[in-house]
């Protein structure tokens, strides 16, 4: 028979599945779009500490991977898949609306907080409920004689998953960090609103196929409850002394005669496979930190690559891209080549994958040590940083006012000095009169400048935060003796576009936020606003706008010239140095996560599919629970040490796994073994998403 063309095959598809494809693309965009920027939102808008933001981020993921159990029960026993998707998607939209409203800065914080966290809970609950239903409902639309079409459909289904997540990871950070709204450098209302609109579109697309869908009634059967019943019966009898009265070969055999021997054997096989899922818990604990601790690290990296700039959340896009590239390479070339040299088994692949995941965190730890060298740490408790700028006048007899204690040799040098918070007195050398400076608020940085005027000395000071700028910006403070509200300072790029402006007043500042494509070399102009408006201003100086840096523009009162003083060092470690850890953890995902699920299906009884899926989802839940307990509580205060701890923990877990794997006996091919069709394989992996929209190839091992 002549092979049908792709177009002919597409015409043979049930029309309803095309609505499901659009629905899946939009839903994945909405979920990943929101989740990609969530961690930075918690830090910047709610001003949570990194550990608290990590705790909430992983709590959200925990809920999203625990609620699928509720969704599957409702679909199988109460409503059916169609109604669960319909109701869940409607609630999903409400969650996005709540989160988008909570991002509006005009609202009071209690209102914003209530909207945000109720929205996050609703989204986590809704996405979890529909998670076990969408791909299965799409498969329901095909008849039994359309298995080849169904298998091909899941390739398109994967494209929808990967396309939605990939575009979301790239686009929503741009909406957050490169669009300004409501007077803020970030535009979270837009960044959350666009995924909300996509979820609404997903619901509309789903409704458009209403009349075409095959809606199967709920099966009313829950295998999971039967498994629990078998285990409970066995344990109850063992506690009651049944093992002494009637010896058995396996403790689960105590469940007879209340349960059939087939169910007991299936449960035994399930528990044997369960040990394989143990390393997956720790894998997810490491893997899901790409959205939290690795983003935190990326915020302190230099995102400029030539004239392009990469936002911290966007580097995560390398994961789905690498998966799409690596999986066919491994299936088509790597595994066949290795089979010529050695035996390639699923357990061996999983062991290598786990060790690679551990290695990726070791690399992250080394990178963090390099990042630490560029970090700015706040002053010690009860102390301040005093940054003196300018050379107009020497400062002498610098003393602590309360006890007259001389600081050092009494000469305050140019640059940064760490001091006790308090009030200080000093002489300028121009007149024999004492000056005073109040720097009594602890744990801050202060800028101090002494200007020599005609017959007087002007002392200027202002405070600043001792931390790197957010959003990749370069901040330039102004310090001057000639404060003038009618004179403006402009930051202008090479194209003549005004990037930012402020009044000529000490403590005011301009922020230079890099665009998607931008030149780091900008110029600062200043002059009277009634006679100049940018490049035509008479005074100018060149600035190299490095990400994360904070400068002071010291404007001389007599010459109107300016010079820069560095307050906070720039992000000098390139974000490209994080690529190795992302590529290696993706290799670990391909070898451990994808292989693990396929292996579990090949070793368990056919009636255990739904229970295996539930167990798979629970490994993601448990992994994020570990993140909450360790990273979310700041159990290890230093980020680099924390990365090394996770790496060591994964090595230990994989060591135990390897010892167990050496004793494992594979289930031989027989009639009771699950036959994994490509559509089923993709169906289940699509259900769990492998957190990045992982696709598998069309080859089966």
Curated annotation (Swiss-Prot):
| Residues carrying a glycan | 391, 432
What's one Pfam family the UniProt record gives for this protein? PTR2
Q: Does the keyword Transport apply?
A: yes
Please tell me where this protein is predominantly located: membrane
According to its UniProt entry, the protein's GO biological process terms are: dipeptide import across plasma membrane; dipeptide transport; protein transport; proton transmembrane transport
A Gene Ontology molecular function term for this protein is:
dipeptide transmembrane transporter activity
Q: In which tissues is it expressed?
A: Expressed in the AVA interneuron.
Transmembrane portions of the chain = 29-49, 55-75, 91-111, 119-139, 154-174, 188-208, 269-289, 318-338, 351-371, 575-595, 611-631, 641-661
**Purpose of the protein:** Neuron-specific, H(+)-coupled oligopeptide transporter with broad specificity towards di- and tripeptides in a Na(+) and Cl(-)-independent manner. Shows H(+) channel activity in the absence of peptide substrates.
Official protein name in the record = Peptide transporter 3
Name its species. Caenorhabditis elegans
